[in-house]
Amino acid sequence: MRHLAQARNLEIPGSRFARPGMTKPAEEKMAQGKSLEGKSIIVTGAGRGIGREIALLCAAEGAKVVVNDPGVAADGSGSSASPAEEVVEEIKKRGGTAVANFETVAEAIPASKIVKSAIDSFGKLDGVVNNAGILRDAIFHRMSIDAFESVIKVHLMGSFYVSHAAARLFREQESGSFVHFTSTSGLVGNFGQANYAAAKLGIVGLSKSIALDMERFHVRSNCVSPFAWSRLIGTIPTDTEAEKARVAKIQQMGPEKIAPIVAFLLGDAARDVTGQIFAVRMNEIFLMSQSRPLRSIHRGEGWTPQTIAEHGMPALKSSFYKLDRSADIFNWDAI
């Protein structure tokens, strides 16, 4: 935790996170130029929450945006055109360009139509934000097969389907940026989210593989792990005073805080950033670790189950990870 503690105290002079549409940041943006001018961007799950804020900021930064959202409930049920249409309307009111798309990411052919929508509407595609998601939490032994599979389909398979449909375009034009959403539920762990955690950690592997495979074609792939209040965590219980206090703190972490790093990763200023995992919590940005060996042991004559028990495990146990959750690791108030 030493490096994390140092990161907590690092303040960048003059840095800020700006909510799209506010007067002063808008003036600053005009002075600085637009980081996504002329680009075509897909944002999945863009009808509400984090996806909405990403779509709004990308448009404010000059991108033409495909606002994808089938308008399902937090558990994936139902559908509505309104969320995507309302975001498109808001973008147009602010002088931007956007089209709505209502396809699901959970199946290959509909997902490919999201990419087709960008080409048909804007003639090109420069970036993909895989943000779409649902939640169906349950303690593992009570989790249904359907609950597990449906979350995997939207988060992991959805990220694959949309990325795969865009990959050949990016290969041909030798440029492009993928931004995938992971979670500390996968990176660290959480109760009752085996489906969500498996999907989100799978997305990290997907992103790294894309980064390795496509770096030679100048195509980038990164992950963002958000801390933000959205409808997907709006079902947190508030039965006790402690739970109410926790929710009050989380509600301060608005989804607009996540959008700036996503817009950055989509832009040319991030041309040398790929294969990384970033977390955002209020005004903090973290570069997250990736799996590497911690300790090693060796025995010239090899190991048996007995010698592992007697010598191997005792030597390694001091470096074991605890069964931590995200709240155990990020245990200070958001800045």
Task: Please annotate each region the language model reported.
Residues G33-V66:
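Canonical Rossmann dinucleotide-binding motif of NAD(H)/NADP(H)-dependent dehydrogenases/reductases
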Residues I91, I139-F140, A147-I152:
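Substrate-binding pocket helix/loop in short-chain dehydrogenase/reductase
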Residues S183:
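Residue(s) in the substrate-gating loop at a strand-loop-helix junction
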Residues I54, A60-E61, E86, R168, ...:
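Active-site-adjacent segment of SDR/Rossmann-fold oxidoreductases
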Residues S163, A199, S207:
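Active-site helix of classical SDR
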Residues F102-K116, I145:
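The beta1-alpha1 cofactor-binding region of Rossmann-like NAD(H)/NADP(H)-dependent oxidoreductases
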Residues K244-I335:
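C-terminal helical subdomain
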